Design a protein with these regions (language model features):
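Intrinsically disordered, low-complexity regulatory segments
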Residues: 52-58
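A conserved beta-turn-beta hairpin within the catalytic core of GNAT-like acetyltransferases
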Residues: 61
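Charge-rich, well-structured scaffold segments of protease-associated domains
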Residues: 1-51, 65-93, 98-181
Length: 181
């Protein structure tokens, strides 16, 4: 793996500053690049095939003696959100996510809190990979509430689709995004 992907053939070399570019390239070739044979490297990042059905993973982790086992689970639901190269979708999702999960009184977060699924409910959007992932996490939860978490997410999102999102919430999401960038 390392010899194939961490090879000069699979790299970009950037030069910066005031210099004689031809002289610098000749030096790089003599001192570095000429010591390697060219490799044809297919380093395209392939999209992961969607799961045919939901996938459940259970992992054990240590808790302190003062923690109750029935209130120490971390429940996470993950969703692939398009493609990171779709800038419009990426921006729209960040605005939407703020409106339904981050802002005070956000409907999805509020529904999960009111359903008593965990003591700390958060959403996070990882958009620095080819297929961005949105995660909804309930910490200090009961493991038995895993199905309840997914049902509440589905039910609440269906309700949001039916009833819509207030324009002020979307404006707040846009303002939040503008503030971050």
């Amino acid at each position: 793996f390392h010899r194939k992907y961490y090879h000069p053939s699979n790299s970009y070399i950037y030069l910066y500053g005031d210099m004689d570019v031809v002289e610098r390239l000749e030096w790089m070739d003599k001192e570095y690049l000429s010591k390697y044979d060219y490799l044809e490297v297919d380093s395209e990042i392939k999209k992961q095939k969607p799961f045919d059905k939901p996938c459940f993973v259970k992992k054990e982790y240590a808790i302190s003696d003062s923690e109750k086992e029935e209130e120490s689970a971390v429940l996470i639901s993950n969703f692939v959100i398009g493609d990171s190269l779709d800038i419009e979708l990426n921006i729209a999702f960040q605005i939407l996510e703020y409106a339904i999960m981050q802002m005070p009184g956000a409907p999805l977060k509020q529904a999960l809190i009111e359903a008593n699924i965990g003591k700390d409910v958060t959403g996070s959007y990882e958009d620095d990979i080819l297929q961005p992932v949105y995660s909804i996490t309930a910490k200090y939860a009961n493991e038995a509430d895993a199905d309840k978490l997914n049902q509440m997410i589905d039910r609440t999102l269906e309700n949001i689709v039916r009833t819509g999102i207030h324009k002020d919430a979307l404006r707040a999401g846009l303002n939040s995004l503008e503030f971050k960038t």
